[in-house]
Amino acid sequence: MLSISGFYCISIAFLRNNTEILNHLGDFLFFDPSILIGSLLAPDLGGYSIVEMISKDPNMIVFAGVLLTSTIGATISFQLPIFLNNLEKDDVPSFMQGIAYGLIVLPIVLILVGLFLQIDSLMINMIPLLVLCIILLFMFFINLKLSVKILTIFANMIRILGYLFFFLVCLTFFFDLGFTQQDLIQEVFSIVFQMTLIVAGSLVLCQLILKYFSLQIEKLATMLHINQYALIGLILSLGTSIAMMPLFSKMDTKGKLINAAFSVSGAYVFGGQLGFIASVSNSFSTTIFIIAKLSAGILAILMVYLFTKRRMEN
């Protein structure tokens, strides 16, 4: 929450005061610069606010600021560094293989949503995203240790910047030093409060499901050919994928692949990301956010079942 406040206030204030830089940024790129921002940053780590400032097209804000940031942006800047540094070594290969499944299906859903939103030059704007997915897949399978180091450094830089920006926000709030504007500080207070309510509600909902539907969960897990821990992990991921991390080592192999694949797009769909998106955008964007993330997450799960079935047949 601290880093969210820092990024939101400082990044928007900076962009407000440097609009000429943003206007010239597109002159050096063959694609919309918001695509690059959305592919590298989570929505609540500055991704959405930066995209909103640099893009004049409301549909591109939905595409890059809402969808890209909440899928591949969140995966790169938040999920991968945390999981790769906290999972047991034996679980990392299964996790990375699942992430690969999630990355493979993600462009399919994004292209369909882009067509629905009528994004100009969609396939040209998809080039950097496709290249980024290919690079990630290549890094994962060629040199996993180096990939972990690079992503960890990137995530730590984002985290440190977030805390530094929050410190500057605090200085401005008390001493009016001009690092940001007071209206942004008041606005971010409201955003964080709404996020907290939604996250708390989603966690309570998950606990109620686990408490009163444990038998149904066990039966459903048997039908899906995964163990109970894997199914619980999927349910928890709807709120936050971090909640399923302690369960990862207890999952069966297929369950690990499914949870990792789903986390690329489906994680946080009813958690903090939903709270943030609902706070800063309209109901249309929020609806697209939920439908697209769930669709990509479910498609990733189906991809895992398809490939594991073929392996068993071979």
Regions found by a protein language model. Give the residues of each.
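Interfacial loop-to-helix junctions that mark the boundaries of transmembrane helices
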Residues: 24-28, 117-128, 151-155, 183-191, ...
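C-terminal transmembrane helix pair
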Residues: 61-112, 133-134, 239-314
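Transmembrane helical segments that form the transport core of multi-pass membrane transport proteins
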Residues: 10-26, 151-235
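Hydrophobic core segments of alpha-helical transmembrane domains in multi-pass membrane transport
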Residues: 4-13, 103-113, 129-143, 160-173, ...
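N-terminal signal-anchor module of multipass membrane proteins
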Residues: 1-42, 49, 304, 308-313
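Transmembrane helix-loop junctions in multi-pass membrane proteins
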Residues: 12-21, 49-57, 112-119, 140-148, ...
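Hydrophobic alpha-helical transmembrane segments of multi-pass integral membrane proteins
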Residues: 28-55, 200-206, 223-248
